[in-house]
């Protein structure tokens, strides 16, 4: 949709990977719609994933005992976070939609993407207490997880060996994105890359491109325990 801004937070080491292809499809399709698309390619940026004292410029508010959450909150208010954090926060603030593109690692995100979430979505910028979930500071924005798995779709069902995929998405979609106020769209999961044929991969890419054509018309999922755990 013309005028919309999209941030793609991309976490894969190899540009020629299937994740790279999914990212490329998203950039091309959304650009065709007139969207402004920005990509944070975390590996090529050498993005620092560690949450440390070095994220704060100047003296800490408590020089005796360091608390990352407290210190980054204070630093955000004083504009004393490092430039790489502020730059990513600027991208998020400007975006109408944030797409996270990554391979599933141990039922979660790669460490570099976890570090992005830890450092960028700090208190004061993304949330406060009170000021979370539906009152989170990123309310009004959309977020979407686009991920790939080695295992097949059958493995990630309620009766499958890995359990329903909704279970492992709970911490990411509800505990992180919804907590910060995002409206969360249904995930785009490309299953079974370890066993998929070239033709099957082409179908996955085409399906992603087709979905993106109407992405702005989608309704967000219900970020509640019943949706995730089928209560």
UniProtKB/Swiss-Prot annotation:
Subcellular location, principal: cytoplasm
Catalytic activity of the protein: 1-(beta-D-ribofuranosyl)-1,4-dihydronicotinamide + a quinone + H(+) = beta-nicotinamide D-riboside + a quinol
Residues annotated as binding Zn(2+): 174, 178, 223
Cofactor detail note: Binds 1 zinc ion per subunit.
InterPro entries, alphabetized: Flavodoxin_fold, Flavoprotein-like_sf, NAD(P)H_dehydrogenase_qn
Residues that bear Phosphoserine: 197
EC class (word): oxidoreductase
Gene Ontology BP annotations: quinone catabolic process
A Pfam family recorded for this sequence: Flavodoxin_2
GO cellular component: cytosol; nucleoplasm
Needed cofactors: Zn(2+); FAD
Binding site for substrate: 127-129
Gene3D superfamilies: 3.40.50.360
Superkingdom as given in the UniProt entry: Eukaryota
Compartment(s) where it occurs, according to its Swiss-Prot or TrEMBL record: Cytoplasm
Entry keywords, A to Z: Cytoplasm, FAD, Flavoprotein, Metal-binding, Oxidoreductase, Phosphoprotein, Zinc
Amino-acid positions noted as binding FAD in the UniProt annotation, renumbered to this chain: 12, 18-21, 104-107, 148-151, 156, 194, 201
E.C. number: 1.10.5.1
GO MF: chloride ion binding; dihydronicotinamide riboside quinone reductase activity; electron transfer activity; FAD binding; melatonin binding; oxidoreductase activity, acting on other nitrogenous compounds as donors; protein homodimerization activity; resveratrol binding
Sequence similarity: Belongs to the NAD(P)H dehydrogenase (quinone) family.
Miscellaneous notes: Uses dihydronicotinamide riboside (NRH) rather than NAD(P)H as an electron donor.
PANTHER family to which the protein is assigned, alphabetical: NAD P H OXIDOREDUCTASE-RELATED, RIBOSYLDIHYDRONICOTINAMIDE DEHYDROGENASE [QUINONE]
Function: The enzyme apparently serves as a quinone reductase in connection with conjugation reactions of hydroquinones involved in detoxification pathways as well as in biosynthetic processes such as the vitamin K-dependent gamma-carboxylation of glutamate residues in prothrombin synthesis.
Descriptive protein name: Ribosyldihydronicotinamide dehydrogenase [quinone]
